[in-house]
Amino acid sequence: MASLSQSESGRLYSWWWDSHIPKNSKWIQDNLADMDSKVKTMIKLIEADADSFARRADMYFKKRPELMKLVEELYRAYRALAERYDHTTVELRRAHKVMVEAFPNQMSFDMIEDSASSSSEPRTEADTEALQKDGTKSKRSFSQMNKLDGTSDSHEADSEVETLKRTLLELQTEKEALNLQYQLILSKVSRFEKELNDAQKDVKGFDERACKADIEIKILKESLAKLEVERDTGLLQYSQAIERIADLEASISHGQEYAKGLTNRVSEAEREAMSLKKELSRLQSEKEAGLLRYNKSLELISSLEKTIRDAEESVRVFRDQSEQAETEIKALKQELLKLNEVNEDLNVRYQQCLETISKLEREVSHAQDNAKRLSSEVLAGAAKIKTVEEQCALLESFNQTMKVEAENLAHKMSAKDQELSQKQNEIEKLQAVMQEEQLRFSELGASLRNLESLHSQSQEEQKVLTSELHSRIQMLRELEMRNSKLEGDISSKEENRNLSEINDTSISLEIQKNEISCLKKMKEKLEEEVAKQMNQSSALQVEIHCVKGNIDSMNRRYQKLIDQVSLTGFDPESLSYSVKKLQDENSKLVELCTNQRDENNAVTGKLCEMDSILKRNADLEKLLLESNTKLDGSREKAKDLIERCESLRGEKSELAAERANLVSQLQIMTANMQTLLEKNSVLEKSLSCANIELESLRDKSKCFDDFFQFLKNDKSELMKERESLVSQLCKVEEKLGVLEKKYTELEVRYTDLQRDNKLKSHQVEELQVSLAAEKQESANYKRSTESRLADLQKNVSFLREECRSRKREYEDELDRVVNKQVEIFILQKLIEDLEQKNFSLLIECQKHVEASEFSEKLIAELESENLEQQMEAEIFLDEIDSLRGAIYQVIKALQVEADCKTEQKITKDQISVSRALGEIDSLKGSLSSAEYEMHRLVVENSVLLSLLGQFQSDGLVLESEKNILEKDLKTKIHQCGMLEKDKQDLQEANRLLKSKLIKREQQEQKLRAELKFENLKFESLHDSYMVLQQDYSYTLNDNKTLLLKFSEFKDGMHVVEEENDAILQEAVALSNTCVVYRSFGSEMAEEVEDFVETVSSLREISTGLKRKVETLEKKLEGKEKESQGLNKMLENLQEGLEEDNFLTGLLEHQVSNVDEILEHREMEILEAEHMLKATNNENEELHKEVEELRKDYEDSRRMRANLEWQISELSDVAGRQEEEIRKLNALNENLESEVQFLNKEIQRQQVREEYLSLELQEKSNEIGLWDSAATSFYFDLQVSAIRELILENKVNELSGVCENLNDEVVTKTTKIKQMKETVGFLESQVTELKSQLSAYDPVIASLAGDVKALEKSTHALTKFPATAYQQRVGNNLEESGSTTSPCNGIVILKEINPSIKTIEQAFVKEKGRLSRQITRSTSQKRRDRRKIENIQPDDQVTGESRQPRLRPEMTEVKNELLMKDNPRDQVTDSLTYGRSQGTSHGSNDMFEFWDESAESETSVNFLINSNKPQRSLNSNLRHQSRNPSIESDKAVGVVDKLELSRNIEDKAKILERLLSDSRRLSSLRISLTDLKRKLEMNEKQRRFSNADLVIVKRQLKEMEEAVSQLENTNEILSKEIEETGDARDIYRKVVVEKSRSGSEKIEQLQNKMQNIEQTVLKLEDGTKSKGRKMFSETRTVILLRDIIHKGGKRSARKKKNRFCGCIRSSTKEE
């Protein structure tokens, strides 16, 4: 039967069913096609892509209204379909009811209940027109069905029932399809809305970022411009001070040059004096020559002192100039101190402003806390006022209130502002709505499942629905009871809370008034401080005028000084250049004052802006407080409404029939709501703009705080730099003090030199007077010397000119070196600052990374929670649609806030609601924390942007420094090329460079102005931000490359400077300065290496930071997109919630008691109107500001194109700069190659210079030696002539070398040392001469003794009486011994001449006599031989008697010699004296010289035993007296004479050998003492190393011991020879061998002495020339001695080693 009924009902309702199938219904097909087309267009709009994210956001923003329209149309179509479905189900229910009544046994009641439950679902007012149309159609179809029922019979009813069952199945399938389509459409719409919201939020975020970036860039650029001005002024002042110091050093160097000229004149005078001395030495005797030379040296010193006195006057002039410069430096220091004080005052005031701002912020925060506390209390009171009954009463008066509100909204468009304050409230509502919609969607899913199992479980569902209805009715009753209880409590507490609100608001108003008064006071104080600063600036102007007057007076004085300097011979152009520099400094000081005024004006403007910003902040904080209170109220309302919705669900089935009556009223309300929704959208936009403004203002305040902190740090850094500059100035002052001390020492030295010069000039005049008669003889010599002197003077004048030019160049290079050192110091400071900033950036990036990770976690949790909420919202969407309008009106009408504490009073039946509320609260907390994190991230991004701007400014500074360095490089290259040109060319080049600098400065100023203009117009869009970020990265890379190139350029510059320094050192011959500059170069190279390492580390850090920043930005963008999607979902849910609230309000309006609540709510509405009026005024102001912001936004959009164009230009400029950098690299490579070549040449020149300086010293020493030698001996004239030729050659060489030298400036200390060395050297020479003279005197005395011995021998030959002869010889010897003083040597030589003549005559007579005697005695030879034979036994007896006495003595001597001999002294060299040939000569030769050798024996013994002259003389006399007694006793005259002559000759040879050995030992002793004295002097001056000194001292000690041993052996041998005069051949041979070995050892010691002297000279001078010179000097002394004492012996050694040359010549004559 059931199947039959179903088939019959399908047939009966087929005509109706066919009209509702999509295939047969054109209306459904059109709707579905329209929906599909709209969905496709939306998908196309959303999937449209763009080049960048910013353009995509812009495109979405432009297409937003189109998408909104499509969404609205799609939603309306969906609502129409849903309403159509609802009506069809209602009609089917009615038809089913009829069939059930007609056929109760065949049909079930499930269909009716199901259709009722499904039809009870509400729909929105936006589709009322479709509802009306569908309603009319359904009524017609229902009337037709009634007619059919009335007319048809039971059979037709059965068929219709069957057809209806079939149609129900088809409707269920269609319903499922429609639900699936609906869900798909909803998902698409939500996705589209998410994307739209993301795009909108991205645009807003980018706008905010751009605004922040604009503000921060403006502020930072202004601050950087100010700081750059301050830094430039400080650098200019420092450079001016350095230039003045350089001018002072230049003046001092001029004084040094003048002193050097005087010293050169003194040297010329000394040369003239030396030439005069040479002339005098030819004409005067040896004694007078020594005295005159000593007097001349004294007179030279006095004349030099006079010249130094003359130089004192010029030095005083320079001292006055230095004092004037010091006064200028002091004035500049005072100005710097004043400026520092002004800056410190500004810093203090700035800190005070910051403190006041922080205090105000704290007070504002306290006020906000108080306001929040009050609002929470108000909410707690207002929550209890809101009850379900009051809301029902409001719903009854809904129509009236809506009319009133419509009129108010028509008259007052400012009602939009109320919704601005409710923006945050709406977000929380949207969260609640999301939960409700998720519940709604879940219920929809459940309803669909119920429809699937409709036929099988219809009866069970009916029972469940009836039970649910009963339970809900009970719940409603319980709610009514609770509401009645709550009304009493709320009425009692409402009054208390109102009073507390009034009190709290009055207190807060008083606090705000006090804060405003404090702000006004602070403003007045700041204005007073600005006035003080203006006064200070005026005082600074007065001081500047005073400085100008001082500068004018200084210029006049300086012109006078220039005249004086021009009179002295200096160039006044350098002084005029310094005057120009002073004028430039004055102009720069004026610019500084103007800049300070501008800074003061800017500070006042900023203070005014701060006041206005504080006022705006106060107003905005008030608005925020009100909005927060309203948000809390709306939250509580939403909670109450949710509770009511749950209580009213049970009543929906009963109220569904009554809804038809209210449809007409809803149509009117829907029209009004549409208008309100449009207004609401406009207000939402304005509210979003206002929120953006609020956030931008907050960011601005934070940016100001950061900027103030940045300014503080920059001020502290500037103060540090100033302190460093002050310390450098102090160092410069110390240097000036040292220079002044040196200058005073030079003055003293100069006075001494002047005195010496005057004395020398006086001496020269006296000598010229004394030598007037002798000039005729020496005219030729004078002419040659004068020509040489003229050439030398020309060379010296030419060298002086070159030295002056090189000195100026040296000073310029020194100034440049100082400037480069200052630049290096500044760059080191900048590098340290960059390192600190990078370190802070690293820390901040780490913080950002941590925050981003935390935000990711929070966002993940939020996403999960949002998904859950979306599911719940989908369940509750259908239920909340009917409540939206009522809730919206309730929010408008009540405006009362509820407390969260009401959750505690919820009953057990409402546990699900409390749980939902708890989830909402947790979601709110998570959203607030997410908002806080996002806000913090935005602030940190703003800080990063400020740091990026700072880095950009640093890059600009580096570019400016690079330009300056390029200019310096060009000027230096130009100077290197133009060194040989005249001063006019240099001045023209300087003018051209100045003009170029002025042009480039103008260009830089233009560029800066353009940059400021562009920065003012800078947009905050993401496109420009990304482009700027890329440009910033490129500029960072360029700056790094520039830094590297700059470091390489600095290396090149340092190399060039080292080359220049080395060249200057070559010219000046300053080995010490050469070492200093090399060490400086090595230090600078190390610093450059460190700098390169730091730059590389900074590059790595910056790249890492960039990567981290990019990742953070990507993450932030993703998070912003997600948050925007969530916000859009919340907004959509809020709209649905409002619609649901409206419908629930309508339903509650019918249930509640209307009369009681109407009166109460009318009073509240009046109060709300007053509040609306107050808020409207504020909203109008905000609307105006929003319009202004829109205008600014359009302007910023226009600026964007300009910025992109400028960025392209900047990229082109960067490319050009890269090309220039490549060129500079090529130039640097060329310069480095040239530098290496110059370094090699410099090293060669240094070696050559040292060699020449040593040669100069050697020549000066040699001149003194040759002068002393020329005055003492005649033969030194030839040596002096040879050395003059050598000197002339070397002077020519030196003149050629001096042309290549760059400078001959010698510092004061080196001059003093040289003078001390020359004085010490002269003293040593005097001591040597004295020692030589003391050595000559005993030689002369010995010659006199020899001559007298020859006289004695001649007298003996002429047969004088023996006794008288001995007495006379003794007297003569005593006289000679007593008269051999050093002063009477020349007198003795003069006295020897007549004695020699007498000796010659005596020898001639004696030769004739002997020849006659030999002819006579031929007959007596036999008799004589017999007599000799008789005498020989006697002699043998006497010899045997003497031998025992001699042998022990000789053994003792032999043992002593063996003990004292040193094996190291035994060398197998040739002897200085030839071996004696014993007794191989003939008897005639012995007979000729025995008298002479006998007399020489006495003289030799006298000289050897100088300590005991009387004893040796007596012994000689004893021997002489002994011989004549033997002759008289034995009466053998001729034979005895022959024997005695042989013995005496042998003895004389031995004594002569011993005498020569003693002389050589004495010379060794003198040289040892000289070397010891030199070593002591060098040890005091620390010229030698300790190891060298130890070696030389040890060698000298060994030499001294060996000399003392040889002296002892020589004395012993001489004593033995004297005591054993008649010794035989054996003993004589022993003595001869000992003397020979002693002479060999002495030769070895002489060679060792020469080696030691050479080593000492090498240590002193470091060259071999010195050693050769000293060797030649020592050899000249030895040669003189040999020539005087043993010259004849050397020649005699070649020819049988005869004793004396004069006697040998006499033998030849025989």
Swiss-Prot record:
Top-level lineage group: Eukaryota
Key words, A-Z: Coiled coil
Coiled coil: 152-446, 474-546, 579-883, 974-1021, 1095-1259, 1285-1336, 1559-1665
Chain ranges of the NAB domain: 13-92
GO cellular component, one term: membrane
Keyword Chaperone tagged: no
Basic and acidic residues composition-biased segments: 122-137, 150-159
Record-linked InterPro entries: NAB (IPR011684), NET_actin-binding_domain (IPR051861)
Disordered: region residues: 113-159, 1409-1448
Expression by tissue: Expressed in root meristems and at very low levels throughout mature vasculature.
Signal peptide interval: none
Mutant lacking the gene: phenotype: No visible phenotype, due to the redundancy with NET1A. Net1a and net1b double mutant shows a significant acceleration in root-cell expansion.
Any one GO MF annotation of this record: actin binding
Family: Belongs to the NET family.
PANTHER family: PROTEIN NETWORKED 1A, PROTEIN NETWORKED 4A
Job description of the protein: Plant-specific actin binding protein. May be part of a membrane-cytoskeletal adapter complex.
Protein's UniProt name: Protein NETWORKED 1B
Organism: Arabidopsis thaliana (Mouse-ear cress)
Higher taxonomy: Eukaryota, Viridiplantae, Streptophyta, Embryophyta, Tracheophyta
